[in-house]
Structures are given as C-alpha cells and as structure tokens.
C-alpha cells in the first residue's frame, strides 16, 4: 500500500 498511497498523493 506504500506505493499506492504515494501515487495518490502525487496524483492529487
């Protein structure tokens, strides 16, 4: 879930 969370924050 680390990468997914990072991607979401970056996508925001």
Swiss-Prot record:
This is Unknown protein 7. The lineage of its organism: Eukaryota, Viridiplantae, Streptophyta, Embryophyta, Tracheophyta.
């Amino acid at each position: 879930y680390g990468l997914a969370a990072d991607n979401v924050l970056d996508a925001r």
